[in-house]
């Protein structure tokens, strides 16, 4: 399964913020430049992450963004479910768009659904804290100050 850029960017933002010193504010420009991501795309991602409570945004001079909750409380499977807009990995997953003639008797849909559930179950085992256990290495690659 391929994640959308939106979900990929969401996870990257969370990793970036988790690698920062606790309470430290970051900004969209800094994250966009670090990952070579469009600021416009990133603003949409951060807005949604804020709505979900994963990030806290502080407006005004001296403002920025930081994690809105402890990395231990941010479940990766949950983030993926809330940021992916389509888990219909084949046509027959969507009853409104399914034109496949063998769909009523085909076993593929059930196998793929089982695989999708297993994929999400693995992601459910991990938190953001698990993804930044090597925080010092991440900080070096992101060129952050320790």
Curated annotation (Swiss-Prot):
[2Fe-2S] cluster binds at residues 92, 100, 106. Gene3D superfamilies: Winged helix-like DNA-binding domain superfamily/Winged helix DNA-binding domain. One of its GO terms (biological process) is regulation of DNA-templated transcription. Its cofactor is [2Fe-2S] cluster. GO terms for cellular component: cytosol. InterPro entries: TR_Rrf2-type_CS, Tscrpt_reg_Rrf2, WH-like_DNA-bd_sf, WH_DNA-bd_sf. It comes from the Bacteria. Pfam families: Rrf2. Residues 2-133 form the HTH rrf2-type domain. Binds 1 [2Fe-2S] cluster per subunit. GO terms for molecular function: 2 iron, 2 sulfur cluster binding; DNA binding; DNA-binding transcription factor activity; metal ion binding. Keywords: 2Fe-2S, Activator, DNA-binding, Iron, Iron-sulfur, Metal-binding, Repressor, Transcription, Transcription regulation. Residues 28-51 bind DNA. Nitric oxide-responsive transcriptional regulator. It represses the expression of flavohemoprotein hmp and the nitrite reductase nasD. Probably plays a role in the up-regulation of the resDE regulon in the presence of nitric oxide. PANTHER family: HTH-TYPE TRANSCRIPTIONAL REPRESSOR NSRR (PTHR33221:SF4), WINGED HELIX-TURN-HELIX TRANSCRIPTIONAL REGULATOR, RRF2 FAMILY (PTHR33221). This is HTH-type transcriptional regulator NsrR. The gene is nsrR.
């Amino acid at each position: 399964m391929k994640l959308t850029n939106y979900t990929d960017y969401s996870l990257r933002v969370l990793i970036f913020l988790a690698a920062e010193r606790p309470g430290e504010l970051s900004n969209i420009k800094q994250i966009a430049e670090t990952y070579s991501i469009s600021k416009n795309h990133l603003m949409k991602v951060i807005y949604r992450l804020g709505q979900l409570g994963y990030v806290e945004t502080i407006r005004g001079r001296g403002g920025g963004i930081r994690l809105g909750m402890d990395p231990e409380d941010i479940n990766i499977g949950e983030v993926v479910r809330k940021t992916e807009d389509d888990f219909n990995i084949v046509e027959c997953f969507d009853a409104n768009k399914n034109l496949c003639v063998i769909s009523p008797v085909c076993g593929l849909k059930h196998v793929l659904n089982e695989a999708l559930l297993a994929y999400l179950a693995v992601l459910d085992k991990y938190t953001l804290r698990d993804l930044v256990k090597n925080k010092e290495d991440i900080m070096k690659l992101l060129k952050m100050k320790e």
